[in-house]
């Protein structure tokens, strides 16, 4: 009998699903929401190895953990929140946002928590996936420790930042003090008065150090190579801004669009080396460092990279240099020789610590690790990727049928929010999944996998473009690329370009098999669409139109108060300059950078 994919998976069909999604983080939730709102498919399961939704935001609990992208853009386009506490959300607030979204869209009934996928194997005869699942929960394991789940389509939503990377340093297992990885934080440990060694100076380290420095007796940061760092300029969002964002929806739209325009403009800064904007940002980074460390000129050269900005992840922080300026915080750039029983030994020094923090990132280029995946003919994903991970637009893999990835190879960004990429991928994959499910409902079969020659041509084009970007700078080694220099993680262009290229599924790019393949092949292409967030008008038009609407609502609500509003001296496509009287302040002209935030600040000044 034909299968009904509109029914939820219940007790009687616990081991069968039309779709299985691995991971309940940003990607997995987005995929599930698209299935709910873009297809009639309800027979799907989300397997989450943790005990909550949120993915990396549920796992990274370290002090100071926060997003590097503004909240208006680092959130789903279809779930814009008007009451973020600050421009850059912290881990706890973003996790709350994720749980709220999961609750609103009814995702919890589809999620199986504490479920670790060990292996996924394609059955050529049955044309289905067989997924081996192990249960982490002690209570669940009383019923069964593991089981096998069959599905017609498998989606990996495990992302790139899910498996911690532990450094290969001799003696790490000999250390007798407290050892914590930044992605596996232990809040039961008391950090007050402790001597702490922090290995690493990347995105997590610069957020951890300022927090630990508040109570630690001494901190030493072990730096392998310097990073480009810019100020975060984080601002709390006040009640009046919340009011405006809540009751003037076009203002939320304007703010997100302007952030999108600014972030896309950053592509020329962070990805294209040698441009005037890139050199200006490098100069700004050095100016910021020197202004924050005026009494430590001996650190200026040590903290200045010799590679193009953007080659490694650009760091943003308002308080890292302030922490580094403290008398009880040191920077050590000598290579670590080994970890001793009591601390860290370099070539000419040994320091004892109560705690060593491993801020050493993730195994980002080892996609799906440690899950064992076997595609058509039993061919392993490890074998398919022996020359490096590659996937068609980061989503589909040769010889791996009815399989899709979210945030897969070459879809990470150095300049914008990855959620914008994930939403485009989720739309694309939901179209493919719908085709497979429709065939199944008609008691037919449909097997989809990318043509090897299409994938090869695509990958060559991507790598050729990447070779011209800052990511390829030989002077730096980053998690964007393998030890051999192959860039496996990053997309070489803008978000808008990616969205346009995946706005339709071109069926000729795929090998279609099964009794339902002919009907799909006849379609040539299926339009997916995209979220259009690049403004079709100038910043000036956006400013004036939304300001008029916001001003009207705001004035009606607060006209009985006395306000001193600064005079706007200049408004243009390149930014704003404003200031007058007691509340005067002037911003640098920056192309669309914080135009919406600037407007909100004008409208949010306190009473005179």
Swiss-Prot record:
InterPro entries: FAD-bind_Monooxygenase_sf (IPR051209), FAD/NAD-bd_sf (IPR036188), Flavin_mOase-like (IPR020946). The keyword Flavoprotein applies. The chain crosses the membrane at residues 17-37, 535-555. FAD binds at residues 56-59, 68-69, 74. One of its GO terms (molecular function) is flavin adenine dinucleotide binding. Glycans are attached at residues 4, 114, 325. Its EC number is 1.14.13.-. Its cofactor is FAD. Binds 1 FAD per subunit. It is a multi-pass membrane protein. NADP(+) binds at residues 66-68, 201-207, 224-225. One of its GO terms (cellular component) is membrane. The keyword Flavoprotein applies. It is found in: Membrane. Keywords: FAD, Flavoprotein, Glycoprotein, Membrane, NADP, Oxidoreductase, Transmembrane, Transmembrane helix. Non-reducing polyketide synthase; part of the gene cluster that mediates the biosynthesis of the bicoumarin kotanin. The non-reducing polyketide synthase ktnS first catalyzes the formation of the pentaketidic 4,7-dihydroxy-5-methylcoumarin from acetyl coenzyme A and 4 malonyl coenzyme A molecules. Further O-methylation by ktnB leads to the formation of 7-demethylsiderin. Then, an oxidative phenol coupling catalyzed by the cytochrome P450 monooxygenase ktnC forms the 8,8'-dimer P-orlandin via dimerization the monomeric precursor, 7-demethylsiderin. PANTHER family: FAD_NAD(P)-BINDING DOMAIN-CONTAINING PROTEIN-RELATED, L-ORNITHINE N(5)-MONOOXYGENASE-RELATED. Belongs to the FAD-binding monooxygenase family. This is FAD-binding monooxygenase ktnD. It comes from Aspergillus niger (strain ATCC MYA-4892 / CBS 513.88 / FGSC A1513). The lineage of its organism: Eukaryota, Fungi, Dikarya, Ascomycota, Pezizomycotina.
